[in-house]
Amino acid sequence: MAKLLHLSCSPRPDSESSAGARVFLDGFRQMRPDWDIDVMDLWRERMPEFAGPIVEAKYARMKAEAFDDAQRDSFAEAERMATRLSLAERVLISTPMWNFGIPYKLKQWFDIIVQPGLTFRYDPASGYLPLLKDRPTLVILASGSDFVTGMNRGRTDMATPYLREALRFIGISDVRFVPIGPTTGPADPILAARETAYRRLREIATWF
């Protein structure tokens, strides 16, 4: 069965990014009712802290050294999470922007799955090479203010370039972003931004 992996990155089920994901998935399910939607809620998912054995496992792997038992167990968790990504034909990431970047749980997910031999490899002649096949990926990114006309005009959106580059590093370059913002302040701009995003999400769902 074809699969879409949804990385749900907000701790609030009624958040703007979560609501946008529901709009998209409603349309996606109508177009592809036979697809499996694998939801990975990063605030409820069992994820190892990127410390201790899993860090040592990463460096052992890079040096082609054998794992000890603790490293083997930790690396198995990274394999489990990376496999869920590699088995998905489509990826949806719904996330808020926090302090111009991404939530720490999403960064933790990247830190865990970006492992040598799992999602990238190193070649002395060519440098770092991705191991995942490219696949359509949609990022719904909600922010309190927009970065064109709102309070954050002129400030740097660090979430979008980070996500684009982190995904490209492991092989995923077919990435589209749908921003939702502003999500705070006067009601009219919020409603207008929401409707613009929802309209685009419904359209993307017809062909994604």
From Swiss-Prot:
Entry superkingdom: Bacteria
Catalytic activity: 2 a quinone + NADH + H(+) = 2 a 1,4-benzosemiquinone + NAD(+); N,N-dimethyl-1,4-phenylenediamine + anthranilate + 2 NAD(+) = 2-(4-dimethylaminophenyl)diazenylbenzoate + 2 NADH + 2 H(+)
Cofactor details (free text): Binds 1 FMN per subunit.
Keyword Oxidoreductase: yes
Record-linked Gene3D superfamilies: 3.40.50.360
Alphabetized Pfam families for the sequence: Flavodoxin_2
GO molecular function: electron transfer activity; FMN binding; oxidoreductase activity, acting on NAD(P)H as acceptor; oxidoreductase activity, acting on NAD(P)H, quinone or similar compound as acceptor
Its EC number(s): 1.6.5.-, 1.7.1.17
Binding sites annotated in the UniProt record for FMN: S10, S15, E16, S17, M97, W98, N99, F100
UniProtKB keywords: Flavoprotein, FMN, NAD, Oxidoreductase
Cofactor(s) the protein needs: FMN
Role: Quinone reductase that provides resistance to thiol-specific stress caused by electrophilic quinones.
PANTHER family given in the database record: FMN-DEPENDENT NADH-AZOREDUCTASE 1, FMN-DEPENDENT NADH:QUINONE OXIDOREDUCTASE
Family membership: Belongs to the azoreductase type 1 family.
UniProt subunit comment: Homodimer.
UniProt-recorded name of the protein: FMN-dependent NADH:quinone oxidoreductase 1
Organism: Bradyrhizobium diazoefficiens (strain JCM 10833 / BCRC 13528 / IAM 13628 / NBRC 14792 / USDA 110)
